[in-house]
Amino acid sequence: MTAPELTAVDLYVDPSCPYAFQTARWVLEAAKVRSISATCNVMSLAELNGNNPDLPAEWAEWLVKAWRPVRVLTAARLAHGQEVVWPLYLAMATAIHIDKVEDYDVVIANALAEVGLPADLAAAADSTEYDDEVRASHHRGMDPVGMDVGTPVIHV
């Protein structure tokens, strides 16, 4: 008997989004009982909404903060491979949405330590060095569905 062919599921998420976190957890649970292979990819709420002149000031300020985890996720992927994205994403999102940690310096440092990645990756949070790659990943997720949807995006 041959194993069933796996269906590829590409999930595009921003750690700051609670809806993405719930969807990611659901996808991982579904992967336990269905023939799917789920890949976690970065999208950015800041990239999606940052050029909207109608945003309230507090939302615009929050979007600046939202760049930080996606930059670190991207830096980690580029330095250590795609396989670190799921655990790092889950560590960040759990800290933000379950543990209610609001200080993203703490979220990032603790998540990197939890998954055994170098602490110096945290420097990517405040660097624009990875922004082009964040945008590229964001657009790989968003372009097929249009920019009038938010996070998460799932491609099957």
Residue positions per predicted region:
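Short alpha-helical
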Residues: 18-19, 132
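A structural signal for isolated positions on well-ordered beta-strands in alpha/beta enzyme cores
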Residues: 8-10, 39
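Structural alpha/beta surface segment adjacent to cysteine/selenocysteine redox centers
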Residues: 15, 21-108
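Short metal-coordination and nucleic-acid-contact micro-motifs, chiefly zinc-binding Cys/His arrays
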Residues: 5, 13
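Short, surface-exposed acidic/glycine-rich loop or hinge patches that mediate macromolecular interfaces
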Residues: 14-17, 128
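C-terminal cap of thioredoxin/glutaredoxin-like
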Residues: 6-7, 24-32, 102-156
